[in-house]
Regions:
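Ligand/cofactor-recognition surfaces for anionic moieties
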Residues: 4-1020
Length: 1020
């Protein structure tokens, strides 16, 4: 097959031809030649258009290097998530205040001599964009208002656009015309032309001298609506971008004359347009979009999975940014009051009179805190068990980390934020993978004479002083920050004086080393520290303390060297941006500092690592045991959402878990690379082999095909073993599939994803567009989008029937969290895939399935929880936490946007799994919609985000997903009427959807319905 026609592009060649050069800062992996079989030999021939592409781009970089800065033009692209509201989500970027970042970059450009006239700050930038309506048309923004208010950066004439369009390949032109009509755009099947005014294409944006700021065009829909009819990408996952999308990028290159294109933040949609995974051709839409413009991409250093896609599919040179400062979530309001009552109870529980009164207060506070759904507190439950469960629940919340606002590009943490940042790095504890690098928590625990492993494992246990292990962990965290604060504030930063100070007892405060520690009764009154020579004169502790202090000094230095804006300006001049590693800084990857580099990922041949295998074994064991407790039987089939972050963040813990469930174990070469696997004998395994149904992310599919092949080969090997069916569920299910008509190979297909070249699960799009009527619709959409099989010699074969058959035996679905930097409300893909997989499994099997969520934040103490419990933890620690909310409020429009997106994802989880408690929706309503202070915040900064939240809440109630008290519902409705009046004033004239929720499923759209009928037959 010609490499141009291979849907996946490169596969086995990725490692040596693409990934390895990235380690040295190599960019733009463009294929310029390929092998072709001739009569008697394999010839190598150039690919003409690719050679032209490469040389054109090289010339652009060379020209950039020679150009004076006052003549350099820069185009900034702010991302947008139409499905979460175009008006509400301008500048979408994970954990980055993109608006303030762009403003500061423009100011630095002005200082460096660029001809730019920057806005005062990020607020002025977003206010200008919104007042001009320099965005795509959507619910509250008709095209005539965009033009009237000055949002049009340019009008592209039909004839001008056709010169570019007609130069595209015939297949590309045909696909675009079939979807969006002839240039400049026409109504097709009731879907209007995208951004066309008086037969001209409207390009939106705001100009600041030699810089423009544009909001990325919508992807896959058109018009001032959002419903199942206009959401064309739902009907066709491979739908090409609109004429206006293509025209925008060509205007920036050819008419505005951008020398550099800068996509701001993680992440946009250009790199996820249809086309090959890597090694793109002229028919791939990311390649068409980027053209020949040098491309710099501001990206979060903790996101190698998606950053790699941007590098390989949109030819981006990344300039990574620092991760957001993390801080302890802590307890608040009724949770803090419950904690106080529990502490008081431990002090007086032998006083019957006071104990009796406190019991009632504790039970009342448990109910008030909405913990009664997790803590059984009836007459049959011993009160000590209630107390234990309460401490356990509070421990999960108080010791979770949360984001302290957002990062601003080029701004390094200072003062207390620097202390928090360094502490979040040093607290990671995994003795096996960190070698001799002890965590600061383990050091402090050792100084206190405590066992950190015991504290983490059982946070409900009460010590002799009446404190729970969860409270002790919180105190250890506080002491850790005291030590860091002392060291970075010490003028001389002498290790010897710091270490001496820790062990000098009463002289501690006098020396001015660390009054906070010496005055802490947990330390100063602890004889283990100050009167016990075994500790105070322990050379091992002194050595570990010295090692921690050296790491603090090193981290502080590398934080200071994170010159992000300087690196970006370096790129503006066509200069080299050094390569650097990437990953989760709270997972031990502090080598991502300093930021401002072009990050690379990892060597996939080493996955899973030996440490990850141990974690994966634990995960599989805990999952099986939990299912045994819940259902009194082994799970026959577990449905997995396997993401690329498992490979890049966790070294393949999830991959190892899948292998362990199947009953195989990795075999490594002496250099640590994976050689293959071996079968674990049933006698040694001690349980049946568990089958798996894996929905793999498109990023993992495209960048780590070797990992897919290992799992696929393991499934085939296990299914062919000569073992009893009741001890080998993969074999049992494969035999059943053969009886139903599958061939031998088809019966072992267990790894599925979206069609090659596409990257969504479909379900999140349907949920956001209200394009579903019931769970069956979501199940059908999941099957329609994800019925393509992958594995050894299987590259995206259509396999809807095999997916449906495999889903019939799924007993539980699973995903996991590996760090507090990300959680299940952090992206719509979590509910779109995991929730969609759950809905599809329920519909295929005709029964409920368990929804589980793993937790490897502490790799040596893994947990598997019910999804409902994980949702409660995440909502309490972040979304409803006043500390997190205040951090978001510091970022105005962008903070309001991020709050709204999280609320939308709560709705998405309920729509797809029905695992969200009513009290969560109640508290969201009270906290964000009805609270006067919060309403003012949204009204002043981002009223569109408030409207989006309130509308979703009302939709949840109308669909029966939430059952609020009548009084609360009435307040919400009244508030929404007021919000809607604000919106109508902002919208102006013209036709627009506004706040109307129009439920349009595939049954209501003939073209879409025809495609879905076959899917419904398969699933039913």
């Amino acid at each position: 097959m010609c490499i141009r026609d291979r849907s996946q592009g490169l596969s086995t060649e990725i490692g040596w031809s693409v990934a390895l050069p990235e380690y040295e800062g190599g960019i733009e992996p463009i294929i310029i030649g390929a092998g072709k079989a001739e009569e008697n030999y394999m010839g190598r021939f150039p690919i003409q258009d690719r050679c032209s592409k490469l040389t054109s781009r090289i010339l652009k970089w060379i020209e950039l290097r020679k150009k004076p800065v006052d003549r350099i033009k820069i185009a900034f692209i702010l991302h947008n998530r139409p499905c979460t509201g175009v008006e509400a989500s301008i500048g979408d970027a994970a954990n980055l205040d993109s608006l303030e970042s762009v403003s500061r970059i423009l100011h630095r450009m002005q200082e460096a001599g660029y001809s730019v006239d920057p806005p005062r700050d990020g607020k002025e930038l977003i206010d200008t964009i919104l007042s001009k309506k320099a965005i795509s048309e959507f619910r509250w923004t008709p095209i005539n208002e965009i033009v009237k208010n000055g949002g049009a950066l340019a009008f592209v004439e039909k004839e001008e656009y056709e010169k570019f369009f007609n130069a595209l390949s015939p297949s590309v032109r045909q696909k675009v015309i079939e979807s969006w009509g002839n240039p400049p755009g026409e109504e097709v099947n009731g879907i209007p032309a995208a951004m066309v005014y008086e037969n001209k294409i409207v390009v939106t944006g705001v100009r600041y001298g030699n810089a423009v700021v544009c909001v990325q065009p919508k992807r896959g829909c058109a018009g001032s609506r959002c419903d199942g009819k206009v959401c064309k990408i739902l009907h066709d996952p491979e739908v090409p971008p609109t004429h206006q999308y293509l025209a925008t990028y060509r205007y920036l290159e050819n008419t505005f004359g951008a020398d550099v294109l800068v996509h701001v933040g993680t992440h946009g949609n250009l790199e996820f347009l249809p086309g090959k995974g890597v090694g793109l051709s002229e028919d791939c839409y990311p390649d068409i979009g980027i053209g020949t413009i040098p491309h710099l991409y501001i990206y979060n250093s903790d996101n190698p999975p998606e950053g790699t896609i941007a590098k390989r599919r949109s030819l981006a040179c990344l300039v990574d940014h620092m991760q957001t400062v993390m801080t302890s979530g802590g307890l608040y309001e009724s949770l803090a009051e419950l904690d106080r009552l529990l502490g008081e109870y431990e002090q007086v529980k032998h006083d019957r009179g006071r104990e009796h009164a406190l019991k009632h207060l504790i039970l009342d506070e448990i109910k008030k805190s909405n913990l009664d759904s997790e803590i059984r507190a009836d007459h049959e439950t011993p009160f000590e068990e209630v107390i234990r469960k309460a401490h356990e629940a509070l421990g999960r919340i108080r010791n979770s980390q949360i984001h302290h606002g957002m990062h601003i590009f080029g701004q390094i943490p200072e003062g207390e934020k620097k202390v928090e940042f360094i502490n979040s790095i040093l607290r990671y504890d995994d003795k096996e993978s960190m070698g001799n690098r002890v965590s600061i928590r383990r050091l402090i625990a050792e100084i206190l004479g405590l066992d950190l492993d015991e504290l983490i494992t059982d946070q409900s246990r009460i010590s002799e002083n009446g404190k729970s292990n969860g409270q002790r962990l919180e105190e250890i965290d506080s002491l850790s920050k005291d030590l860091i604060r002392t060291f970075i504030n010490s003028p001389e930063k002498k290790l010897s004086s710091i270490i001496r100070g820790i062990f000098t007892g009463q002289n501690f405060a006098e020396k001015g080393i660390n009054p906070a520690i010496s005055q802490n009764p947990e330390v100063s009154q602890n004889p283990v520290i100050f009167q016990n020579p075994e500790v105070s004169q322990n050379p091992a502790i002194s050595q570990k303390t010295a090692a921690i202090c050296e790491r603090v000094l090193d981290l502080e230095s590398r934080i200071e060297k994170s010159l992000e804006i300087e690196a970006l300006l370096h790129g503006f001049e066509g200069k080299y941006i050094p390569a650097g590693p990437s990953g989760l800084i709270m997972r031990g990857r502090d080598d991502v500092l300093p930021t401002g580099r072009n990050f690379y990922s990892l060597d996939p041949r080493r996955v899973p690592t030996k440490a990850a295998w141990r974690v994966g074994q634990q995960l599989s064991g805990v999952l099986v045991d939990k299912h045994l407790r819940d259902e009194k039987r082994y799970p026959e089939n577990v449905g997995f959402y396997w993401m690329a972050n498992d490979i890049m963040w966790a070294d393949g813990e999830g991959m190892a878990q899948i292998m362990s469930l199947l009953g195989v174990e990795p075999v490594w070469l002496s250099n640590g690379q994976l050689k293959g696997f071996s079968i674990i004998p049933l006698k040694e395994l001690g349980r049946p082999r568990v089958d798996v149904t894996v929905r793999v992310s498109g990023i993992l599919r495209d960048n780590f095909p070797n990992c897919l092949e290992v799992i696929d080969e393991a499934i085939q090997a296990v299914a062919s073993l000569d073992e009893p069916e009741e001890m080998n569920y993969p074999k049992k299910h494969s035999l059943r599939m053969i009886e139903e008509g599958a061939d031998a190979r088809g019966s072992t297909l267990r790894i599925f994803s979206s069609k090659p070249g596409t990257y969504s699960a479909g379900v999140q799009l349907a949920v956001y567009a209200s394009a579903w009527k019931d769970e069956k619709d979501l199940a059908d959409i999941f099957l329609y989008w994800n019925g393509y099989a992958y594995g050894k010699n299987v590259k995206g074969e259509e396999a809807h029937a095999q997916l449906a058959s495999s889903l019939k035996t799924v007993d539980a679905t699973f995903n996991k969290v590996v760090s507090d930097e990300y959680d299940l409300l952090g992206c719509c893909c979590y509910f779109g895939v995991h929730g969609g997989l759950t809905a599809a499994a329920k519909q295929a099997s005709g029964r409920d399935v368990r929804v589980y969520f793993g937790d490897t934040r502490e790799p040596q103490h893994v947990e598997v929880r019910d999804m409902a419990d994980e949702l409660r933890r995440v909502v309490r620690t972040r979304l409803l936490n006043p500390k997190w909310i205040e951090g978001m409020k510091q970022h105005g429009y962008k903070g309001a946007q991020d709050i709204s997106k999280r609320v939308g994802r709560v709705y998405g989880w309920e729509a797809s799994t029905q695992e969200v408690d009513d009290w969560i929706f109640d508290d969201i309503t009270k906290t964000f919609v009805l609270d006067e202070e919060m309403r003012r915040f949204f009204e002043e900064n981002n009223p569109y985000a408030l409207e989006e939240m309130a509308r979703r809440l009302l939709e949840a109630q109308s669909r029966g997903l939430w059952d609020p008290d009548p009084e609360l519902l009435e307040e919400l409705k009244n508030s929404y009427l007021e919000i809607e009046s604000w919106m109508e004033e902002l919208a102006g004239d013209g036709e627009f959807q506004g706040g109307s929720v129009d439920i349009v499923s595939f049954e209501d759209v003939p073209d879409w319905d025809r495609k879905m009928q076959e899917i419904r037959k398969i699933l039913r």
